[in-house]
Amino acid sequence: IKHINDQFIAHFLEAVRAKQGQQFYAVGEYWKNDKDSLDKYLSEVKYKIDLFDVPLHYHFFQASQKGRDYDLQELFNDTLVNDHPDLAVTFVDNHDSQKNSSLESQVKDWFKPLAYGLILLRKDGYPCIFYGDYYSIKRKQSPHRPILDILLDARKKYAHGEQLDYFDHPNTIGFTRKGDEAHPHSGLALLISNGEDGDKI
């Protein structure tokens, strides 16, 4: 949508929602790894559209490339979901990030379960799973589907209530969800690590 006039988008969505109701959902892809540009766009369209959190995707990409040399405490720095949690569509990979594409930035396989855990089980953002990660790419069955099914089930049953973050170590971070009365037995803890050391008490 970065090549479409932003005022047109704002007026178009106003017109559609006047007919279809204010809950009519819209999301745009503005592929730029610069949160300030995305902030400006959201302001120009009067916050009428959600955006894919491209900066978060690039954090995941860098984390998967650097391994233990990436500071996990910085994963959500300068991301849409950090500043606009209700307008951010969080994702790990998509068709644009695949190998040999013009925007190649594919998250390595080892980090994908960690990244999906972070977007599916946290309270902020609107998580989106890449078709290729759940089903297949080039008719080859995805190895990620079993863990995604577990995470989706955990999201449905347990990812409710207040969230407490423990982003206090460069190689080991985590968070808890306290659960709520509307979802009996809900609540969870997620811990991720990209190195050998680190602990949470």
Where are the predicted features?
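Active-site-proximal helices and loops of the catalytic beta/alpha 8
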Residues: 2-201
